[in-house]
A protein has these predicted regions:
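Juxtamembrane regions of bacterial inner-membrane/periplasmic proteins
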Residues: 2-232
């Protein structure tokens, strides 16, 4: 009969070592992400997880890919475009601290009723996802994202969060940021975009690889109405 007394401690020790290694790895990765967010307070991100993901997808599938990405100060993005994106993506952006629990509750109720019409992610959550996690979805990623959202709110502040988001968000195939989107779709600088153009651009953000501004008249009208209701 084999002696299992010596095997059990070995297995227990190996499991403990693995768990310890796993915890240390998670803590180190989280700390690195937090440091990147802190650095982003002063340094404009040169790239994001979404940018890298799209490059890899193009390389794997041997498809042509041209990246348009130019980071500009928030002051060079028209107020109309800033307001349109907030109205479309996160109406309570300036009221919450990273999570909009009101929207979470509505989304949960719609899920239960099978009538989901909108997401509950805030601009801060979307920024964290863009910077670190790409477009994939999983409970593990959601948990990691949620742990970094308060850090982003604390170290960056609302205006810097909005500035980075508007500059890195995907606005079409290979098109990142407000300046690139405005130049591509409207042949204009981001500072010169008016209300109608801004609403159409904001309307494509939920599905930037499928939508085009010229086809977003109905949704852009809703965004314009929201802007008016918000005093913009």
């Amino acid at each position: 009969m084999p002696n299992t007394d010596t095997k059990t401690p070995l297995r227990t020790g190996s499991l403990r070592s693995f768990i310890r290694w796993l915890v240390i790895s998670v803590v180190l990765l989280w700390s690195l992400a937090a440091l990147i967010l802190l650095a982003a307070r002063w340094i404009d991100p040169p790239t994001t997880a979404v940018h890298i993901q799209r490059r890899l997808q193009a390389w794997i599938h041997h498809t042509p890919y041209r990246e348009r990405y130019k980071f500009i100060p928030l002051g060079q993005i028209s107020a109309d475009l800033q307001h349109a994106v907030i109205a479309a993506e996160d109406a309570r952006f300036y009221q919450h601290h990273g999570f909009d629990w009101h929207e979470v509750q509505i989304a949960a109720e719609e899920d239960l009723e099978g009538e989901r019409t909108r997401g509950a992610s805030t601009i801060t959550q979307q920024l964290v996802k863009n910077l670190f996690f790409g477009t994939g979805r999983s409970f593990l990623r959601k948990g990691a994202e949620a742990s970094l959202v308060p850090v982003a709110e604390f170290v960056l502040g609302k205006q810097r969060i909005l500035e980075i988001y508007l500059n890195v968000v995907e606005w079409g195939p290979g098109i990142y940021g407000a300046e690139s989107a405005c130049r591509y779709y409207d042949e204009a600088a981001a500072r010169n975009i008016g209300r109608q153009q801004a609403a159409r651009l904001a309307a494509i953000l939920p599905a930037p690889l499928k939508r085009r501004p010229e086809r977003m008249n109905n949704y852009s009208a809703i965004i314009l109405k929201r802007m008016g209701q918000m005093g913009w």
